[in-house]
Amino acid sequence: MRRKAASKRLTLTDQRFNDEIIYRLINAVMIDGKKSVATKVVYDAMDIVGEKSEESALDVFHKAMTNISPVVEVRGKRVGGATYQIPMEVRAERRVALALRWLKKYSESRSGKSMATRLAAEILDASNSQGSAVKKREEVHKMAEANKAFSHFRF
């Protein structure tokens, strides 16, 4: 018999922007528990974003997150010995988690001096619907569209 589902923990907010998603980005960027370093990287990146765009850094970041977040994804399901890629809608929490993961991954793979400049460049590109993270989202959506025929196999 299944136990009760774990309750969602309260997400804290960061000090400067008072935003939950920025706090989660700081945690995603953090390496070896060095939160102060991660905080500095994210805040420096946000400063660069603020300088390079007319809008506020937070607005640009949220626009970028919207452009990166996937709406549908494919998940594998075994049916009679064959594994089908079934398109599924992505839950809101997973959407943010995937967007943050892709933002970090493709920022790291960029060429540039500091992580702050690479992160800022990826955020600016994503807010303009460009960059590797947006490309990844389009790729995921394309896979879901290609496997639309299997959407009747629900979980």
From Swiss-Prot:
It comes from the Bacteria. GO terms for cellular component: small ribosomal subunit. Keywords: Ribonucleoprotein, Ribosomal protein, RNA-binding, rRNA-binding, tRNA-binding. GO terms for biological process: translation. CDD domains: uS7_Bacteria. Gene3D superfamilies: Ribosomal protein S7 domain. GO terms for molecular function: rRNA binding; structural constituent of ribosome; tRNA binding. One of the primary rRNA binding proteins, it binds directly to 16S rRNA where it nucleates assembly of the head domain of the 30S subunit. Is located at the subunit interface close to the decoding center, probably blocks exit of the E-site tRNA. Belongs to the universal ribosomal protein uS7 family. PANTHER family: RIBOSOMAL PROTEIN S7. Part of the 30S ribosomal subunit. Contacts proteins S9 and S11. This is Small ribosomal subunit protein uS7.
